[in-house]
From Swiss-Prot:
Protein name per the record: DNA-directed RNA polymerase subunit omega
Biological role: Promotes RNA polymerase assembly. Latches the N- and C-terminal regions of the beta' subunit thereby facilitating its interaction with the beta and alpha subunits.
Xref: HAMAP family: RNApol_bact_RpoZ
EC identifiers of the protein: 2.7.7.6
Cross-referenced InterPro entries: DNA-dir_RNA_pol_omega, Pol_omega/Rpo6/RPB6, RPB6/omega-like_sf
Reactions the enzyme catalyzes: RNA(n) + a ribonucleoside 5'-triphosphate = RNA(n+1) + diphosphate
Family designation: Belongs to the RNA polymerase subunit omega family.
Length: 90
């Protein structure tokens, strides 16, 4: 895999501080939440994969926010359906 430099990823995000926040958030999604990577993973750790995704333009703060909203909406919808089913049974 090609090496990822912070400078390449900073250009996509704007500054180092926001880069750290976005990369950490995406790395958590990959490592803990089991999200699918937009680049080949190989033997790279989630932080490196997150930086590569940012560098290639697949991940930004706004895409993470939009994905989070979609996930939250799906979770809310499932909870509403569960409550509706319980109420119908009564």
């Amino acid at each position: 895999m090609a090496r990822v430099t912070v400078e390449d990823a900073v250009d996509k995000i704007g500054n180092r501080f926001d880069l750290v926040l976005v990369a950490a958030r995406r790395a958590r999604q990959l490592a803990i939440e089991g999200k699918v990577a937009h680049v080949s993973v190989g033997t790279d750790k989630p932080t490196v994969v997150a930086l590569r995704e940012i560098e290639e333009g697949h991940v930004t703060a706004s895409t993470l926010d939009a994905e989070n909203l979609r996930d939250q909406h799906a979770q809310d919808q499932a909870q509403f359906e569960s409550v509706a089913n319980i109420l119908q049974e009564q």
